[in-house]
Amino acid sequence: MKQFIDFIPLVLFFIVYKIDPQNVEFAGFNLSGIYGATATLILASVIVYGALWLKHRHLEKSQWFTLGACLVLGGLTLAFHEDTFLKWKAPLVNWLFALAFAGSHFIGDKPMIQRIMGHAIQLPQGLWVRLNIAWVVFFLVCGFANLYVVFTYPNFWVDFKVFGSLGMTLLFLIGQGIFLARHLHDADTGEKPKD
């Protein structure tokens, strides 16, 4: 559910980008098209993550990082009227997540995915490592896919940012679910998970 809440600002960004046909001048800035969508992304991110923080008095590190990247790169996009800053957001965020997941093999006693999901499921250590590596690869692929689309198909990147990223995430989560289903402890049969 958390990942879908994280997509709310992105979906609003897409909607404003697609339906904002007019030029809006605000404080000397033209906020049509990508710039109106960027302003919407920033505002929606602040509202969504602000509401989550007010409700739970806590945001996950990934949410803080995503919010920070949105504020900094979105702010630079608006301040300099240059969309290149925003175009680098998805690749940078994905690559830094990949770095965090990869680094967790060397820092601490558990891979990142085990720290996130370990309270909910039990797996042998070798499977946690494999699952964590899969997340590293997923984040790297998402980052490079975003970068490729941004600079190869500049008229399509907003569509890909929403639908491509969401589609890749859903496919990966389905694949992860299938992988986990094969290895989870079966409480009824008493079988041990496969390594």
Curated annotation (Swiss-Prot):
It comes from the Bacteria. Plays a role in cell envelope biogenesis, maintenance of cell envelope integrity and membrane homeostasis. Coiled coil: none annotated. Keywords: Cell inner membrane, Cell membrane, Membrane, Transmembrane, Transmembrane helix. InterPro entries: YciB (IPR006008). PANTHER family: INNER MEMBRANE-SPANNING PROTEIN YCIB, INTRACELLULAR SEPTATION PROTEIN A-RELATED. The keyword Aminoacyl-tRNA synthetase does not apply. It holds the Pfam family IspA. The chain crosses the membrane at residues 34-54, 65-85, 88-108, 131-151, 160-180. It is a multi-pass membrane protein. It is found in: Cell inner membrane. Belongs to the YciB family. NCBIfam families: ispZ, PRK00259.1-3, PRK00259.1-5. The gene is yciB. Its main location: membrane. This is Inner membrane-spanning protein YciB. GO terms for cellular component: plasma membrane.
